[in-house]
Amino acid sequence: MEYHHRPHSPPPSDDDVVVIQMNAAAIAAVDEWSSTNEVDDAAAGKGGGLTRRTFSQAYKMKHRTPLEFTWRQVALLSFQSLGVVYGDLGTSPLYVFSSISLDDPGEADFVGILSIILWTFTMICLVKYVFIVLKADDHGEGGTFALYSLLRQHVNFKGNMPVPVTHLASDINLKFHSKKRILTSKLLKFLEQSTKWQAVITYIVLAGTCMVLGDGALTPAISVLSAVQGIQSRSSSITQAHVVLLSVIILFILFFFQKHGTSKVSFTFSPIMILWFTFVAFIGLYNIIKHYPPILKAVSPHYIIIYFIRNKRAAWETLGAIVLCITGAEAMFADLGHFNKSSIQMAFSVIVYPSMILAYAGQAAFLVKNPSKLSTTFYSSTPEPLFWPMFIIATLAAIVASQALISASFSIIRQSIALGCFPRVTMKHTSGKHEGQVYSPEINYFLMVACILITVGFKGGPEIGQAFGVAVIFVMLFTTNLMTVVMLIIWESNIALASLFFVFFFSIEGIYMTSLMNKILQGGWVPFAITAFFLIITLSWTYGRSKKGEYELANVMEREEFIKTVTTRSRVPGVCIFCTDMMNGIPPIVRHYVQHVASLRELMVFVTIRVLPVRTVLPEERFIIDKLEPVGVYRCIVQYGYMDNHNMEGDDYVASVIASLKEIAENDDEILVLDSALINGSTFVLGRTIIKMGTRHNCLKRFFINNLYRFLQKNFRSNMSSLKINPGKTLQVGMLYEI
């Protein structure tokens, strides 16, 4: 059996596209990566000089090669990143100090709190994310899935993973991303042999992803509430109920206009954030000079010790509010794909970092002289002539921060769907220029309802800050764990250095987590509830898909049976596209189909959509074509990256497949047959399977399959819906899988 990559240009070199020919037995072996690489390692270790080809060497793509930017281009990207990346992080001064509860605080307390903020902000945002985590990109893409993608490219994940593994023999040399030779390490071998730890890593990724969705519901609520609360200081007749109502109206309008996209107004986001950073920096500097210039002594960490000695348990409890100063730090990594490392680093170092330090220092200086204003720190510390300009800018900045998290939620769901670990929902592209701008009505309405309920439920109290902090710190803990594995396996860092990274940052984040766990009943349960909701959907979907795959593999239609069945049926002109999740073998639903039809099309193509653990796939690598038996039967694997758009029209798709088949045709007669089949029309056959789990399985498994998975399968879109097939050309074949 031969797999052919569809060419659209002159034959590429070995460094561009891998074209490997393997026999059928090799293709069926899901452990082919592991066994082949072990042989290569053994040979290399004995001095044979054999070195495994790396992922980037074997699967190199021009648009994955890092681009060179001039300093002007980097500066422009830095400016643009302010409105996308730093909205959440930049608006933290709205609510950090006001979320702190402390009895009778004095000068030493505010200096200590500021010292904690300064060092936390510096260590987490600057050192961890800007200097370290940003380097762990997947061909320019960042975020939790990018880290997971890197690991999947280097570690052979086996077994029934929540995120499906799709092995082909042609992938043997497509495994690695690093340009360095991958050494056989004990950790690598351990991970490749331990399905339990592979599952742990995968569950961390899924949980972290779901936690970000919780962040997407909490950020708009706390940002808008904190910005609008300032209006209470203008009139005693304005109550908290009025603030909540105004916040709900703003949030409703924000979510309502998501369907129109942000392309028409996104150009204003960066100017708004520039104004915001300028205002908070100068107001902070003003407060330092006017109220308490010595506040800058907080750079000395010994004031942290003094603060904890003075306040003991109360100091530990305030950490749950102080952690809000680093909300949005994860966005620097998650939004990396929209910019580049240099631009994000420049924007943070030149604008964001100094502005935030001045803002927090100014608020602390103000509180030293006005400790009673702790609950209304932000607006109370704003000079009277600047109140209304600041109120307007703060509200706009809160909307920008909210928009960034909402857009990130859509993007995360899109990546989850692409990797097969979330049921397909409607994804609409809201911009013709920027493919990353997508909108999902289902996710949008869920976030809107959750956000409004959170706003009404918490009413702007300190509990909403505690809930927000839980979501923030857990995502950071997940990143710390994944980064440690990346440092050891991919970067091949010294184990002492990787251990230092893990211990240092896990300790900081762990201390914050212990404080937040104390607040679970006071609001910290909200992000866990949202995470649990999405995680149940994810696990139900992936577990059901894995059981479906197991059944199809166990009941695959044998080659001899298929040939006999096809040759005994009459053939009629046209093309029949069988859509299947299987890349190897004939699924059992085909047996069910041919038993109920009198004739078959002269051209039959089994099509599988496959998502590779890379950001995007070039058009010339989109199709892998294979001839099957008998004559007129083919297999086509359509490859996408997890950030690619599956937006191919049904008719265009058939034409592309036929064009690919013609390129591997052996003679002119075969080309004529293909052209004739295309002219005579096409039919898409989709399987509609229902899985029923028997009583021999436990109640929990039966509930996941017979109830949750069946509900998701019934109410969400099918995997082939992205092909936009004409319903008049579609035939659905139903079949019951009893497992």
Swiss-Prot record:
Q: Which organism is it from?
A: Oryza sativa subsp. japonica (Rice)
Question: Is-annotated flag, keyword Protein transport?
Answer: no
Molecular function as annotated in GO: potassium ion transmembrane transporter activity
UniProt similarity note = Belongs to the HAK/KUP transporter (TC 2.A.72.3) family.
- What does the record say about its membrane topology? Multi-pass membrane protein
Instruction: List all membrane-crossing ranges.
Output: 82-102, 113-133, 199-219, 237-257, 269-289, 319-339, 348-368, 386-406, 438-458, 470-490, 495-515, 520-540
General function of this protein: High-affinity potassium transporter.
What are the protein's UniProt keywords? Ion transport, Membrane, Potassium, Potassium transport, Transmembrane, Transmembrane helix, Transport
* Ion transport listed as a keyword: yes
Q: Which InterPro entries match?
A: K+_transporter (IPR003855), K_trans_C (IPR053952), K_trans_N (IPR053951)
Q: List the disulfide bonds.
A: none
Kindly list any coiled-coil regions of this protein: none
* PANTHER family in UniProt: OSMOTIC STRESS POTASSIUM TRANSPORTER, POTASSIUM TRANSPORTER 26
Side Extracellular, residues: 103-112, 220-236, 290-318, 369-385, 459-469, 516-519
Provide the protein's localization: Membrane
Per the record, ranges on the Cytoplasmic side are: 1-81, 134-198, 258-268, 340-347, 407-437, 491-494, 541-739
Q: Which GO terms describe its biological process?
A: potassium ion transport
What name is this protein filed under?
Answer: Potassium transporter 26
Q: Which Pfam families match?
A: K_trans (PF02705), K_trans_C (PF22776)
What GO CC annotations are associated with the protein? membrane
